[in-house]
Amino acid sequence: MFITCISSTMPIVSFKSFLSRLWFVTSFYFLGTQLFHNFKNIKRFIWLYVISLLIIIGYTIYRHHQFQFSEKSAIWVMSPFYNDHTAYAAVICLFLPIFIGFIFDRNYTTIIRIIAFFITCIFGVALYLSYTRAAWIGISVAIAVYFIFLFRIKTSLVLTGVGMAILLFFIFQTKIMMKLEKNHQDSSTDISKHVQSISNISTDASNVERINRWNCAIRMFKMKPILGWGPGTYSFKYAPFQHSREKTIISTNAGDKGNAHSEYLQPLADSGLIGSLSFILMVIAVIYRSSRLYIRAKDKEIRMLTLGLLLGLITYFVHGIMNDFLDTDKLSVPFWGFLAILVTMDVYHSRKTV
């Protein structure tokens, strides 16, 4: 990222972006690895964060109730704590698998497990009322990954299945796109209709605008494929890359509203192939090392916590296809904190009973 700051088209913006990211990583990852040498600090971090999150959830649900739990008000009722419902739901998804694990972990007292059950229920209600489709998809994928661990399905079979799915998509992509374009169901408070609207790429303004941003990021990458335009520059540079036929009621000619809506495409535009590959390789490394830690950890509590953390991160890895929040403190704190916990458990706690 530092290298692409030097070659940036807006050096001041890029160095500012670099310093803010460096602050997140230094504070929540590097210092976190030192803090989590003491296993009790891992629990303190999780519980203290969740206690504050529960207060925000209570505030959000109370405000949402004043607007009859409408889908439109769900977008902003969590402000000023979160900018919108997507970041709010993403954080809930990070912690939800951990507390489900607490319910079934007999290392905890009955009281703690009961409290974890009620917190899980609150998270479930909050997630439902957020009307955040990306978060729902993330949770669905995490559930699928859980069953892979539960039934000990071999990695080769999983990779073969994913490869076959990708191959079938490319073979039938024309028919698939024609089918998707016939879906005109917009977002709704009706759960079945809201889920159906996920695949609406024709009339749902949120979905179509997201595709517009993705296409802009890809066009920017094609113009500067190696080092990109510079960290943090997408928001200032994407406007000329919009095509009129792809614009929505949300779009602006100035291109002054938001980012690329993808943790994978944002660095592709900002830092070129190097930036995008760096994030993808980190995702692969986290999944691989966490899976190894889960398999070889001797202590059951370590195993359960590892699985909860991994599934929580997977919800964000999936969510990150459609949104990007790691440039904000709201997601950077739990994200880098989770990575610090996993690394610390792998290095210091995996071969002993805590």
Residue ranges of predicted features:
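A structural signal for hydrophobic alpha-helical transmembrane segments in multi-pass membrane proteins
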Residues: M1-I12, F18-L19, G32, L168, ...
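Alpha-helical transmembrane segments of multi-pass inner-membrane proteins
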Residues: M1-I6, W23-S27, N41-A74, F81-R152, ...
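Membrane-interface helix caps and helix-loop-helix hairpins in membrane proteins
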Residues: S7-K16, Y128-S130, I321-L326
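Membrane-interface micro-motifs in multi-pass membrane enzymes
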Residues: K16-R21, F81-F95, A134, A260-E263, ...
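A membrane-periplasm/extracellular boundary helix in multi-pass inner-membrane enzymes
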Residues: G58, H64, V125, L129, ...
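Long extracytoplasmic/lumenal interhelical loops at the membrane interface
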Residues: F69-S79, I201-N215, R219, M223, ...
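Transmembrane alpha-helices of multi-pass inner-membrane enzymes
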Residues: G161, F279-M282, L307-V354
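Membrane-interface anchor segments at the N-terminal boundary of transmembrane helices
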Residues: Q266-I284
